[in-house]
Curated annotation (Swiss-Prot):
ATP binds at residues 10-17. InterPro entries: P-loop_NTPase (IPR027417), Thymidylate_kin-like_dom (IPR039430), Thymidylate_kin_CS (IPR018095), Thymidylate_kinase (IPR018094). GO terms for biological process: dTDP biosynthetic process; dTTP biosynthetic process; dUDP biosynthetic process. It comes from Haemophilus influenzae (strain ATCC 51907 / DSM 11121 / KW20 / Rd). NCBIfam families: DTMP_kinase. The gene is tmk. This is Thymidylate kinase. Coiled coil: none annotated.
Amino acid sequence: MKGKFIVIEGLEGAGKSSAHQSVVRVLHELGIQDVVFTREPGGTPLAEKLRHLIKHETEEPVTDKAELLMLYAARIQLVENVIKPALMQGKWVVGDRHDMSSQAYQGGGRQLDPHFMLTLKETVLGNFEPDLTIYLDIDPSVGLARARGRGELDRIEQMDLDFFHRTRARYLELVKDNPKAVVINAEQSIELVQADIESAVKNWWKSNEK
């Protein structure tokens, strides 16, 4: 049996780490024990090097297009070398971010050309996409306050609030048009967020059960 690919998306401070735990817990309840966890950017030796370049200040300014191209280079390394092989082996993959992050952060936040974004996505990924995307929706000011509480912010997390409002707006546009995506209110208590995630995964499982 071919595995499934579930992705968790959201702004900084939305609670993706605890959401991952909730998803894995539900999958175990449903009898899915062989689960692979991935993160973007990262997940392979080359992708992790690109992650460092993307998230940290460098000697020269990183242009918006260069940032996007590095993200896609890291993404395709992960997809081809980790995600697809795992799925073909019947394993389930739970990802911390995937392509929707680029569409929201670089397409919405950075305001890169939509045609350029779409062309790059189709060229690199083709029709590969998650089976389920869980988007954790949170007001940027709330999420950033949580992120700051964790310590030092990376290069992207240091962007101004308007950047994250644009990113959130684009996320909401993307999930509205995506039948394979669900929205979770991430401003609730962690218990309610976990309950909503578990319910969403179980409902998705029932609707896709063969």
